[in-house]
């Protein structure tokens, strides 16, 4: 998992423009231009994320209007004596929903009372309770999930529209001989007087009615709706209610996964119930007080592309408890047989996921300081999440020093950060460019044949690594943009996310007309 540490956060919706089809390539360089860097404030005010229906206004309306019957979306096994064990489809009376992550509920079947993870339940008979409803996910994530193994032609999901408030988008997996598996998207528009439609000749009172219709007949869609997109059970938001600073004895260290400069990484079990990753730090690595202060901020940063920080043991030796990612670090994964065989579209998509997580951190005004493949973790379906953000600045080891320390990641660090300690989002952008070379070269060490001192001297004078073998020129040009000596001339992560997500997008419109045959 690399030399530094882990946790999790949330991104900015990207706007759907026009109409869209599938993954095929138009030269990305023809559609993007140098990014006009925007000025940014320095304050950070991260907000905890919750299911789509859990906006503060909606939470109030749930209790205020008496709509307190919820249904379980997944099975859940209690982790503490205060939790409820429940099965998918079980119904609850919500007793207290004043906290975002865990709600007090009473099971209507067993009569028992306890806490349930708020992202595992939804209002009964609501659209959020439907298996095919994926809420506020992006078009790109919809494509990733539908193209996962196990989804047949006609697999579908419905998500919130990224451009029209109160409207939805229908995403369908399709196939043809020319393009193979690909995704088509349709706008579900809302009528002024109520009701929904894709094409005006077929209007429905509810989205549920619309789905039932198109599961019986394709009626102009690319394919009949066959089955909801397969979904992985989500991580709970935290281990349990009030499980933040935990007892060391509640963690069992089961298997060492790796050893870094400042400690070990373990596969562990919390409270005899939950698989977790545990980073154990060597005593003296950082001040427990400073770590706990930073961790309080880190736990608020939540996004699908950031490893979620679950809990901490704040006395030395410090334990950092996070979600477990089955394939470990991106660096190790790239060097392994499975990662080494990845093709360019996979690599670009992984880069886009990292850029998405970093774009969220950019919006939150939070700096990673140690962005590299060793600090990106890989899970099922090639999902990538950023780990170890923010903790590098807390390290007090003399060897973690850009001038003479052997542990400092010089080859990934922007010159203004290495020479003058000026760490900003723009220095993270520089590091991201180096990470792109790691992806393209399947884990090769940057600046091959050069030591740290040589790298620092050469980079200060404008040296760039040459284009890696097999790297498209358009992608290398983006790398070079991230390595501009003037930090303000480097692109934003928002721009990098857009560029990479659309790198293989076809020239077809983003949304298909409803009467397409």
UniProtKB/Swiss-Prot annotation:
Q: Which residues carry this modification: Phosphotyrosine?
A: 32, 196, 400, 511
Show where the SH3 domain sits: 65-126
Record-linked CDD domains: SH2_Src_Fgr
Matching SMART domains, A to Z?
Answer: SH2 (SM00252), SH3 (SM00326), TyrKc (SM00219)
Q: Which Pfam families match?
A: PK_Tyr_Ser-Thr, SH2, SH3_1
Binding annotation for ATP = 257-265, 279
What InterPro entries does UniProt report for this protein, alphabetically? Fgr_SH2 (IPR035693), Kinase-like_dom_sf (IPR011009), Non-receptor_tyrosine_kinases (IPR050198), Prot_kinase_dom (IPR000719), Protein_kinase_ATP_BS (IPR017441), Ser-Thr/Tyr_kinase_cat_dom (IPR001245), SH2 (IPR000980), SH2_dom_sf (IPR036860)
Name the catalytic site residues: 370 (proton acceptor)
Please list the tissues where expression of this protein has been recorded. Detected in brain cortex (at protein level).
| Protein name as catalogued | Tyrosine-protein kinase Fgr
Covalent lipid adducts (N-myristoyl glycine), residues: 2
Q: Which domain of life is it from?
A: Eukaryota
Q: How is it modified after translation?
A: Ubiquitinated. Becomes ubiquitinated in response to ITGB2 signaling; this does not lead to degradation. Phosphorylated. Autophosphorylated on tyrosine residues. Becomes phosphorylated in response to FCGR2 engagement, cell adhesion and signaling by ITGB2. Prior phosphorylation at Tyr-511 by SRC inhibits ulterior autophosphorylation at Tyr-400.
- The chain positions of domain SH2 read 132-229
PROSITE patterns in the record, alphabetically?
PROTEIN_KINASE_ATP, PROTEIN_KINASE_DOM, PROTEIN_KINASE_TYR, SH2, SH3
User: Which residue ranges does the record annotate as region Disordered?
Assistant: 17-46
What keywords tag this UniProt record?
Answer: ATP-binding, Cell membrane, Cell projection, Cytoplasm, Cytoskeleton, Immunity, Innate immunity, Kinase, Lipoprotein, Membrane, Mitochondrion, Mitochondrion inner membrane, Myristate, Nucleotide-binding, Palmitate, Phosphoprotein, Proto-oncogene, SH3 domain, Transferase, Tyrosine-protein kinase, Ubl conjugation
Q: Look up and give the membrane topology term.
A: Lipid-anchor; Peripheral membrane protein
Phosphoserine PTM positions read: 50, 206
**Gene3D superfamilies for the chain:** Phosphorylase Kinase, domain 1 (3.30.200.20), SH2 domain (3.30.505.10), SH3 Domains (2.30.30.40), Transferase(Phosphotransferase) domain 1 (1.10.510.10)
Q: Would you identify the family this protein belongs to, as annotated?
A: Belongs to the protein kinase superfamily. Tyr protein kinase family. SRC subfamily.
- Residues bearing a lipid moiety (S-palmitoyl cysteine): 3, 6
The record's catalysed reaction(s) read:
L-tyrosyl-[protein] + ATP = O-phospho-L-tyrosyl-[protein] + ADP + H(+)
The protein's role, per its UniProt record: Non-receptor tyrosine-protein kinase that transmits signals from cell surface receptors devoid of kinase activity and contributes to the regulation of immune responses, including neutrophil, monocyte, macrophage and mast cell functions, cytoskeleton remodeling in response to extracellular stimuli, phagocytosis, cell adhesion and migration. Promotes mast cell degranulation, release of inflammatory cytokines and IgE-mediated anaphylaxis. Acts downstream of receptors that bind the Fc region of immunoglobulins, such as MS4A2/FCER1B, FCER1G and FCGR2.
């Amino acid at each position: 998992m690399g030399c530094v540490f882990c946790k999790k956060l949330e991104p900015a919706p990207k706007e759907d423009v026009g109409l869209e089809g599938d993954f095929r390539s138009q030269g990305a360089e023809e559609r993007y231009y140098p990014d006009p860097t925007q000025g940014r404030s320095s304050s950070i005010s991260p907000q905890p994320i919750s299911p789509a229906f859990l906006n503060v206004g909606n939470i109030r309306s749930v209790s205020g209007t008496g709509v307190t019957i919820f249904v379980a979306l997944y099975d859940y096994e209690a982790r503490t004596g205060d939790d409820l064990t429940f099965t998918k489809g079980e119904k609850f009376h919500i007793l207290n929903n004043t906290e975002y992550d865990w709600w007090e509920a009473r099971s209507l079947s067993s009569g028992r009372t306890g806490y349930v993870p708020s992202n595992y339940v939804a209002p009964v008979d609501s659209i959020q309770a439907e298996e095919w409803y994926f809420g506020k996910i992006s078009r790109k994530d919809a494509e990733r999930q539908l193209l996962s193994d196990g989804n047949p032609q006609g697999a579908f999901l419905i998500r919130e529209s990224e451009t029209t408030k109160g409207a939805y988008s229908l995403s369908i997996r399709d196939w043809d001989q020319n393009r193979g598996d690909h995704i088509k998207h349709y706008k579900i528009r809302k009528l002024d007087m109520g009701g929904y439609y894709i094409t005006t000749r077929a209007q429905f009172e509810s989205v549920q009615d619309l789905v039932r219709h198109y599961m019986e007949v394709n009626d102009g869609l690319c394919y009949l709706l066959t089955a909801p997109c397969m979904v992985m059970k989500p991580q709970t938001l935290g281990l349990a209610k009030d499980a933040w600073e935990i007892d060391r004895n509640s963690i069992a260290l089961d298997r060492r996964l790796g050893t870094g400069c400042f400690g070990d990484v373990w596969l562990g079990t919390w409270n005899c119930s939950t698989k977790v990753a545990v980073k154990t730090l060597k005593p003296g690595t950082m001040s427990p007080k400073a770590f706990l202060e930073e961790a309080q901020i880190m736990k608020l940063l939540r996004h699908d592309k950031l490893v979620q920080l679950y809990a901490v043991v704040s006395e030395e030796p410090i334990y950092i408890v996070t979600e477990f990612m089955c394939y470990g670090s991106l660096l190790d994964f790239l060097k392994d047989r499975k990662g080494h065989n990845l093709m360019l579209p996979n690599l670009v998509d992984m880069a886009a996921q990292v850029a998405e997580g970093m774009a969220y951190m950019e919006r939150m005004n939070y700096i990673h300081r140690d962005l590299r493949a060793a600090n990106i973790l890989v899970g099922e379906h090639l999902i990538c999440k950023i780990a170890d953000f923010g903790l590098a600045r807390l390290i007090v080891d003399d060897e973690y020093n850009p001038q003479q320390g052997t542990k400092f990641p010089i080859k990934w660090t922007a010159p203004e950060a290495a020479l003058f300690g000026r760490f900003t989002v723009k220095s993270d952008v520089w590091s991201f460019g180096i990470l792109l070379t790691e992806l393209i070269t399947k884990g090769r060490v940057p600046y091959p044949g050069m030591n740290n001192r040589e790298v620092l001297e050469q980079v200060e004078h404008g040296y760039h690594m040459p284009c890696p073998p097999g790297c498209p020129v358009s992608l290398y040009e983006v790398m070079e943009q991230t390595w501009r000596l003037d930090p303000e001339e480097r692109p934003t992560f928002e721009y990098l996310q857009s560029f990479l997500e659309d790198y293989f997008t076809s020239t077809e419109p983003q949304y298909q007309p409803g009467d397409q045959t």
